[in-house]
């Protein structure tokens, strides 16, 4: 694995107005550099360290096999993992952007990824893949750069951010901005809205899992001095995010997700999807309450050249990060059919 970054010399215009100077893109690569690559797009609080959070898909004979393919992942614009975002310093100044960071869109993220690929010599993408917010980027790749992409695998997403998902985003946003330490986004490092960000993560985690998953995993078990086990779990998840994420970046990315709509400024959604001819495997999750499988299946049936696959697991939306053995099989078998090549399903223990 190689870690790197590029600094764009040119001004980067943003879809919703405004521009950024001196944009930095942090990225990771695996395998030998070449003109064709696989691009992995990460979710809301993910990063370019895909071999960490998607470890089960990496290895000899698996979907991501560095001995076979050149693989790239980049931290998204607006995040806080190395690519320019609210925690970055303003050009030529000591001050950080903070709440002054401009609004970004999923399409901005994709355009920046395209510039990165130009810089490192990748001309064509054999596969673009991602789940959740990563799936939003994946689908935009097929619409924005159809001549550059051979195949896509979006996981756990519909054609636009639903009112249900926007509502959940708003609850998380409300928790952050109403924390007294938020201070209109002008908080100091180490003295920010930790409680609000932790609460936002707790809300999100409830949407990432499922009622059956919580019932099976936690039941009504109580822990000494900590209440129910599920309460302790959610508090732990909130605290973990506070240690590694920035509240302004979280708000920036939530807004980008809420603005996601494949039909926006392109015409009627039905026609936009029908004319999308990039081969696609659209994966839904049977227990997903954030992006229900019916919503994902509707997207698959509307695209011009897509198959639908169901990851039938109880963990909810996060199943794409948990049930990686089955996901690897689903994607690998589709790639085998699509490419007509040697199967890429891993043998027992391969690549571990």
Where are these regions (language model features)?
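N-terminal cap/lid subdomain of alpha/beta-hydrolase-fold enzymes
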Residues: 28-91
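Conserved acidic catalytic loop of the alpha/beta-hydrolase fold
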Residues: 95-100, 107-127, 136
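Conserved hydrolase catalytic core segment
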Residues: 124-167
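Alpha/beta-hydrolase-fold enzymes
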Residues: 148, 154-240
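Catalytic active-site module of serine/aspartate enzymes centered on a nucleophile-bearing elbow/loop
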Residues: 297-298, 305-352
């Amino acid at each position: 694995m190689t870690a790197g970054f590029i600094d764009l010399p040119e001004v980067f215009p943003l879809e919703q107005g405004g521009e950024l100077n001196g944009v930095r893109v942090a990225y990771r690569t695996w395998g030998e550099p070449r003109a064709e690559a696989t691009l992995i797009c990460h979710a809301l609080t993910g990063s370019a360290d895909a071999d960490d959070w998607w470890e089960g898909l990496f290895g000899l004979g698996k979907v991501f096999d560095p001995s076979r393919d050149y693989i790239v992942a980049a931290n998204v614009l607006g995040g806080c993992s190395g690519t320019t975002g609210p925690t970055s310093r303003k050009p030529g100044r000591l001050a950080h952007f903070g709440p002054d960071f401009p609004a970004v869109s999923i399409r901005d993220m994709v355009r920046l990824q395209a510039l990165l690929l130009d810089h490192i010599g990748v001309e064509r993408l054999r596969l673009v893949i991602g789940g959740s917010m990563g799936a939003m980027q994946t689908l935009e790749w097929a619409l924005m750069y159809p001549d550059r992409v051979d195949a896509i695998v979006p996981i756990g997403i519909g054609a636009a951010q639903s009112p249900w998902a926007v509502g959940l985003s708003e609850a998380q946003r409300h928790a952050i901005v109403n924390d007294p330490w938020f201070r209109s986004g002008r908080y100091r490092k180490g003295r920010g809205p930790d409680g609000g960000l932790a609460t936002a993560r707790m809300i999100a985690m409830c949407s990432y899992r499922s009622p059956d998953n919580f019932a099976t995993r936690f039941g009504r078990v109580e822990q000494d001095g900590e209440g129910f086990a599920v309460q302790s779990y959610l508090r732990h998840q909130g605290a973990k995010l506070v240690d590694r994420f920035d509240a302004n970046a979280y708000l920036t990315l939530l807004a980008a997700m809420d603005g996601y709509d494949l039909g926006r400024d392109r015409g009627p959604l039905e026609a936009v999807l029908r004319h999308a001819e990039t081969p696609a495997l659209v994966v839904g999750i049977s227990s997903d309450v954030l992006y229900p499988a019916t919503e994902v299946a509707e997207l698959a049936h509307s695209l011009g050249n897509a198959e639908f696959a169901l990851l039938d697991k109880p963990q909810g939306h996060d199943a794409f990060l948990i049930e990686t053995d089955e996901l690897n099989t689903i994607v690998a078998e589709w790639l085998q059919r699509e490419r007509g090549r040697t199967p890429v399903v891993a043998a027992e223990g391969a690549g571990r």
